[in-house]
Structure formats: C-alpha cells, structure tokens
C-alpha cells in the first residue's frame, strides 16, 4: 500500500484520468473529491461491497 500525506486543496493523480483532491478535514473525517471518467465507477467501500453481494445472489423470477 502506498501511503501519501496531502493537505487540504492538494491533489493526487491515479493513472492519466483520475484525480483525488482533499477538500477538507474536520475531526476524524476527511472530505475528498474524485474526478474520473464516466466509465470509471467510484463507490464508498461499504456501497461497493453491497453491490458485489447483490451481484452474487441468485436472481429469482
């Protein structure tokens, strides 16, 4: 795992098209902004896990 330190307003770049910017820090919460192409899905981890769980459940008709 790569660990980086960023201050509010600073950005990191992932690949050629994804940027992640630190928008604010309040207590133990960090607000981040993600710019990515429409074809790149961006989810919070808990939402992604829920999507994956729903995909693995058999569909009933």
Swiss-Prot record:
It is found in: Cytoplasm. Keywords: Activator, Cytoplasm, Repressor, RNA-binding, Translation regulation. GO terms for cellular component: cytosol. Homodimer; the beta-strands of each monomer intercalate to form a hydrophobic core, while the alpha-helices form wings that extend away from the core. The keyword Repressor applies. This is Translational regulator CsrA. It holds the Pfam family CsrA. It comes from Pectobacterium carotovorum subsp. carotovorum (Erwinia carotovora subsp. carotovora). NCBIfam families: csrA, PRK01712.1. The keyword Repressor applies. One of its GO terms (biological process) is regulation of carbohydrate metabolic process. Belongs to the CsrA/RsmA family.
